[in-house]
């Protein structure tokens, strides 16, 4: 593509030599923040979101060329196709309509196979509201007539990571005296055992989240949870009718497989539907978010949807040059494809967002970790980066050393809020002072003269200064984005998540890959199913490669079958 070639030429001639510190110290430095930041009033409820991307190795020509690349890649056309319900998930022949789940336009019409999906979406939301309000108010009782106090979401992948992250992020909007939320995802029995250890079965509600209701990890955990529950309420000493009634009051399903759901013992009316045009990693906006609604209340859940909807409208209707997801996506392409950066760090300076990096580790890597183009040909360029991160300031005392002085360039997103929900003393000011300082330090660095002056003031000898000098120099010129919310609320969280979702979409279109399938998760699952029967006897295994045979046989010879 000509636009890629133009960017490559720009990178070789100018881009790779851009020094941010010199740019800020130049005659144009005073306007660099203004030129390369966007303050967008997403909505009255969300408020302003500030994206400062001035601390990147870019100039105006860089951005102009990146916007040309976006247009040539048909980002706008593909964006419109997604919102209109066209089947852009070509390998599964599906629409991609997580945006429809949060569409707040009362007159919206979005069709899939000729049918408007909006009425179905709103019907499920109404059902979620009715159910969550009954449970939270105490109207819905457990089998002994006690009020539900704990909800356990059993799922994996998108059926787990989204609700886990959002309930943590919105913890300030919950009341643990009304409802506590727990999550089980890992097939390791320890996860379930430790979760239910201190729960009372009479006041616990289980949500089984599986679209097909056949996901091995989820159904195995659900069956074990059911066994624990039945044993706790009396086991075989309790009649079948009582057991059936108890299961009906303590288990609900998020699924499309009514036959398997009812076979499990869950009542049909306690099954919450979602659709095949909702990818797992985009499903927190659907019935998969039921645990969120139970934890913080349906009003806050709908505010969460509304915030995402307002970001959707920004993405859909804003010119590329002013479009936050587009700008972030293009910057990622710049580093991935021209600087050869293989990872990106997400660093929220907000403890409530502690699971945000893990959530988008799945969101980004499962979406864009592809090596085949939409036309079936192998890609010839780098695609999805490795996503990782931890909340500040914890990361500063763990891995920032590598970001500052390591050999790898790691673009970083710093996220913070102007206001804290917990303004204890000077805690928030100290937190934000670190937020500001880290991006400045990564950009500016510390040169030899500055280190020499610093050590001289400390009274060190010239010999000692010479010894320490190379160790204390910071090269700087490390790229960062700063994202500022006014306050972390259901609205602003929804907008923030949608911002990252659309950034991932933009990159997938530019790389010409399908961001909405995940065939990479299938092979391991298939092989695990064939291996499982081999673990149930004492026979030596020889049907695999020597390494796999050796591992299986070591396990079998050392375990008590």
Swiss-Prot record:
Which NCBIfam families does the UniProt entry name for this protein?
PRK00179.1
Q: Which residues form a coiled coil?
A: none
Where in the cell is the protein located? Answer: Cytoplasm
A molecular function GO annotation: glucose-6-phosphate isomerase activity
Active site: which residues? 366, 397, 525
Q: Which GO terms describe its cellular component?
A: cytosol
Q: What is its main location?
A: cytoplasm
Annotated family: Belongs to the GPI family.
Pathway membership: Carbohydrate degradation; glycolysis; D-glyceraldehyde 3-phosphate and glycerone phosphate from D-glucose: step 2/4
Top-level taxonomic group: Eukaryota
This protein is called: Glucose-6-phosphate isomerase
For this UniProt record, the keywords arranged alphabetically read as follows: Cytoplasm, Gluconeogenesis, Glycolysis, Isomerase
- Has keyword Hydrolase? no
**Biological source species:** Dictyostelium discoideum
**Gene name for this UniProt entry:** gpi
- Name the enzyme's class: isomerase
List the lineage, top down.
Answer: Eukaryota, Amoebozoa, Evosea, Eumycetozoa, Dictyostelia
């Amino acid at each position: 593509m000509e636009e890629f070639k133009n960017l490559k030429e720009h990178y070789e001639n100018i881009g790779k030599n851009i020094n941010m510190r010199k740019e800020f110290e130049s005659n144009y430095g005073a306007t660099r923040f203004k030129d390369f930041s966007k303050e967008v009033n997403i909505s009255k409820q969300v408020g302003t979101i500030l994206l400062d991307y001035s601390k990147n190795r870019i100039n105006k020509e860089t951005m102009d060329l990146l916007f040309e690349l976006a247009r040539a890649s048909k980002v706008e056309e593909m964006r419109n196709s997604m919102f209109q319900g066209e089947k852009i998930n070509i390998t599964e022949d599906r629409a991609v309509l997580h945006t429809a789940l949060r569409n707040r336009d009362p007159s919206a019409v979005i069709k899939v196979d000729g049918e408007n999906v909006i009425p179905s979406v709103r019907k499920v939301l109404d059902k979620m509201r009715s159910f969550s309000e009954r449970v939270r108010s105490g109207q819905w009782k457990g089998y002994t007539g006690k009020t539900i106090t704990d909800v356990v979401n059993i799922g994996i992948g998108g059926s787990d990571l989204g609700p886990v992250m959002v309930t943590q992020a919105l913890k300030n909007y919950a009341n643990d005296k009304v409802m506590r939320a727990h999550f089980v995802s890992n097939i390791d029995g320890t996860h379930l055992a430790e979760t239910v250890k201190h729960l009372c079965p009479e006041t616990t509600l289980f949500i089984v989240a599986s679209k097909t209701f056949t996901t091995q990890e989820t159904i195995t955990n659900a069956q074990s949870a059911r066994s624990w529950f039945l044993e706790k309420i009396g086991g075989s000493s309790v009649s079948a009718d009582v057991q059936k009634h108890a299961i009906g009051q303590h288990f609900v399903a998020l699924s499309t497989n009514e036959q398997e759901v009812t076979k499990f013992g869950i009542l049909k009316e306690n099954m919450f539907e979602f659709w095949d045009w909702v990818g797992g990693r985009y499903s927190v906006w659907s019935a998969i978010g039921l645990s969120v609604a139970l934890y913080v209340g349906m009003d806050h859940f709908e505010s969460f949807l509304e915030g995402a909807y307002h970001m959707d409208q920004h993405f859909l209707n804003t010119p590329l040059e002013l479009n936050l997801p587009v700008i972030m996506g293009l910057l990622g392409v710049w580093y991935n494809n021209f600087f050869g950066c293989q990872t990106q760090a997400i660093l929220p300076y907000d403890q409530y967002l502690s699971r945000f990096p893990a959530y988008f580790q799945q969101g980004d890597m499962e979406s864009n970790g592809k090596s085949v183009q939409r036309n079936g040909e192998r890609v010839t360029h780098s695609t999805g980066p490795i996503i990782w991160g931890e909340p500040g300031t914890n990361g500063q005392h763990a891995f920032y050393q590598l970001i500052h002085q390591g050999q790898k360039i790691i673009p970083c997103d710093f996220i913070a809020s102007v206001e804290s929900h917990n303004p204890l003393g000077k805690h928030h000011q100290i937190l934000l002072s670190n937020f500001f300082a880290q991006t400045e330090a990564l950009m500016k660095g510390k040169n030899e003269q500055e280190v020499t002056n610093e050590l001289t003031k400390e009274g060190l000898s010239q010999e000692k200064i010479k010894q320490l000098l190379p160790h204390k120099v910071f090269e700087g010129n490390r790229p960062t984005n700063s994202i500022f919310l006014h306050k972390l609320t259901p609205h602003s969280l929804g907008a923030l998540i949608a911002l990252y979702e659309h950034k991932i979409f933009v990159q997938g279109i530019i790389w010409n890959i399908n961001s909405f399938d995940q065939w990479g998760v299938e092979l391991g699952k298939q092989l695990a199913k064939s291996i499982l029967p081999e673990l149930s006897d004492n026979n030596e295994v020889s049907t695999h490669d020597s390494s796999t045979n050796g591992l299986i046989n070591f396990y079998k010879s050392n375990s008590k079958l």
